[in-house]
Amino acid sequence: MAPRGLTAVAAPSGAAGPRPAILVLPGGGYARQADHEAEPVAEWLAALGIHAFVLRYRVAPDRHPAPLEDAKEAMLHIRNGEHGLPVDAERVGVLGFSAGGHLAATLCTAAATGKPDLDNPAAVPDLSVLCYPVASLTHEAHQGSVANLLGDAPPSALLTALSAELNVTPRTPPAFIWHTADDEAVPVSNSLNYARALIAAGVPAELHVFPEGRHGLGLAAGEPGPGQWTSLCAAWLQRAGWAGSPTGTAAGN
């Protein structure tokens, strides 16, 4: 049975063999999920030949570790193949926006839920795409996300444990990251510091900072500057052997 809130958007048929899959985590400040960062993004990934799974993870009034539990359960479900799609279990990634980017980054840095069946290396993605992420809860953090996820006055040790840039290791998966320099909701330093930590650990990272653009652009169609992110990301996924051209099939299949 599929985990709560998980829906699949299959890549078009036409290629033999298993394909990569990506878990999509929409943003919304851990208070809601933004629809424009959910199924439309999954459909874009599917057009690249990647199976996509959208997770409507738990949000406030549920607190940590509920969203992380949901995300890890979804990752394990995607890898184990119970969904019936031909997924390559060695190529399962994550894509997150804003607070969903925080959830994606904490998956990548193996943040703990305290549940041994979920705190499994198989729940760590093989790559990540982070879109204007809330990467830090300690430095220029998005306070709304902090309050919705952790409540009032969370302990500093927990804030540190859930700040992705402080928990990067050489085993953290590669990342494609983008942000806008004038994001007034989630400062660009979140992306800069996470990318810096990845590079310092020897982890491949591609970072794009666009001079202008409001927070929450999603696919950013028609937006000068940020509207390039999907083509840049598709090229990155192609170089990694995960994607074909739009409406095509995944490379290597």
Language model features by range: what are they?
Residues 33-36, 40, 53-91, 220-228:
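Catalytic nucleophile-loop/oxyanion-hole region of alpha/beta-hydrolase
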Residues 21, 46-53, 93, 206:
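A fold-wide structural signal in alpha/beta-hydrolase
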Residues 177-179, 183:
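Short beta-strand/loop motif that positions the catalytic acidic residue
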Residues 1-17, 143:
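N-terminal cap/lid segment of alpha/beta-hydrolase-fold proteins
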Residues 188, 192-253:
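C-terminal catalytic histidine-bearing segment of alpha/beta-hydrolase fold enzymes
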Residues 73-143, 159-160:
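Primarily recognizes the serine-hydrolase "nucleophile elbow" in alpha/beta-hydrolase
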Residues 18-27:
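Short beta-strand element of the alpha/beta-hydrolase
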